């Protein structure tokens, strides 16, 4: 909004001219989301406590140390969604189609997560919305997003770019729709599965969002895209502002979510954040790079799939002490803080590997 209001005055004012630069607006987005999180955090947490008598239900079969978390309010993802959306509406170019499509997906996945959190709190158990119902809703939203992208961009590509290999790509043709939906829904649920310890998912999400802030900027810049031999996609640079807002809001949320957490992001936060990252990866044509940068989310999800499959195949045996993987290490005797910090380190490594694919070909 500020960008659109100041646009006519760019050549007449030094301050207005600053808003012409995506990098300036992205930096400002981080500052605004951080500030909003610090200011609204205590108010929101107090409000959630007043509404939630028992807080987020704690699984009885989980690590014993988790029983001390009883009473901690959930739905803290509202803080992340609000601060990110406000900064984006203030600083991004509101005539940009990708901004509106991404915000639509972000909020829609957040609503699904809110419904799930609300069901858990109301029933006082960890069973929220049925899994099939959640997948169906996520699928419908993903289809709408894909159709919007196809309709608004007549030259949209169905090519899947393979990182680290020069000029290697796969034309998925009509199958690309299925692939894009899989990426968005899969990303949403992968982040959701990772969000099981205080601060565990928050930092990797920030790293991933920061990485895609850079990717969006490069892909949307003709000079940089040509130099790095990336697929140039006009107008995606504005997503840098949105991604930067996600980084700031996640860091701000971590202030309240660090161990011992004062609030959990809940499915409201994890489903929306995972979904928006999936959407951005589809828009920028860096779907495989998302799987690399978000490697921690992939590992956590894979551990659950393997555990369930092996349990059914062997009629009761388990590969891990508990899934997702972070609970396995807790059951193995690792302190929660050690699991979280080591997983953060792994996330940094994956982010560096993913970003290196932009140059190494």
UniProtKB/Swiss-Prot annotation:
Where is this protein primarily located? membrane
Q: InterPro entries given for it?
A: Glycosyl_transferase_4, PNAcMuramoyl-5peptid_Trfase, PNAcMuramoyl-5peptid_Trfase_CS
Which GO terms of the molecular function aspect are on file? metal ion binding; phospho-N-acetylmuramoyl-pentapeptide-transferase activity; UDP-N-acetylmuramoyl-L-alanyl-D-glutamyl-meso-2,6-diaminopimelyl-D-alanyl-D-alanine:undecaprenyl-phosphate transferase activity
Instruction: Specify the superkingdom.
Output: Bacteria
Give its localization.
Answer: Cell inner membrane
Q: Which cofactor does it need?
A: Mg(2+)
Pathway, according to UniProt? Answer: Cell wall biogenesis; peptidoglycan biosynthesis
Q: Which GO terms describe its cellular component?
A: plasma membrane
Instruction: List the PROSITE patterns.
Output: MRAY_1, MRAY_2
GO BP annotations, alphabetical order: cell division; cell wall organization; peptidoglycan biosynthetic process; regulation of cell shape
Q: How does it sit in the membrane?
A: Multi-pass membrane protein
The reaction(s) catalysed by this protein are: UDP-N-acetyl-alpha-D-muramoyl-L-alanyl-gamma-D-glutamyl-meso-2,6-diaminopimeloyl-D-alanyl-D-alanine + di-trans,octa-cis-undecaprenyl phosphate = di-trans,octa-cis-undecaprenyl diphospho-N-acetyl-alpha-D-muramoyl-L-alanyl-D-glutamyl-meso-2,6-diaminopimeloyl-D-alanyl-D-alanine + UMP
Which family would the database say this protein is a member of?
Belongs to the glycosyltransferase 4 family. MraY subfamily.
NCBIfam families under this entry?
mraY
What name goes with this protein? Phospho-N-acetylmuramoyl-pentapeptide-transferase
Source organism per UniProt:
Rickettsia typhi (strain ATCC VR-144 / Wilmington)
Q: What is the lineage of its organism?
A: Bacteria, Pseudomonadati, Pseudomonadota, Alphaproteobacteria, Rickettsiales
